[in-house]
A protein has these predicted regions:
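Glycosyltransferase catalytic domains, chiefly GT-A lineage
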Residues: 9-132
Length: 132
């Protein structure tokens, strides 16, 4: 019996696209996130900031501003598959992430049968009407 027979891991990735949610009120957080990602990456990575004004200008985003949205990228994070032309793997993270290890490690056990991986965290909205 071959224990690897049913394993569906992706071949070793050479590059990765990383989309970071950008909020103009958190520019420094974005810069720290980007720096920590680049500093520790052992693979080629392309980092894209999801800046709302740029997405609107390129006609990728035309939603009304939601006063209950907690960040400028509350909804634009869901554009990542479209921005990737529905091909390959990409990572999205909020701008307040600090990478303490190599991002390449996250790609080691990807399974081609999965369309999305996500991390759920405990969050209680301050306002019951919040979209988060």
């Amino acid at each position: 019996m071959d224990p690897t027979k049913n394993v569906k891991c992706v071949a070793v990735m050479k590059n990765l696209s990383c989309f970071v949610g950008y909020d103009s009120k958190e520019d420094i957080a974005y810069r720290v996130c980007k720096h920590s990602l680049l500093k520790r990456a052992s693979m080629d990575i392309k980092i894209f900031s999801l800046k709302l004004d740029e997405l609107v200008a390129k006609k990728f985003y035309n939603r009304e501003i939601d006063p209950l949205a907690s960040t400028q990228f509350t909804y634009s994070r869901f554009l990542v598959p479209t921005l990737m032309n529905y091909k390959g793997w990409a990572i999205f993270c909020d701008c307040d992430f600090i990478f303490l290890d190599d991002i390449a490690k996250i790609t080691e056990n990807l399974d081609e049968s999965k369309a999305v991986y996500c991390v759920k965290h405990d969050y209680t909205p301050k306002d019951r009407k919040s979209v988060v």
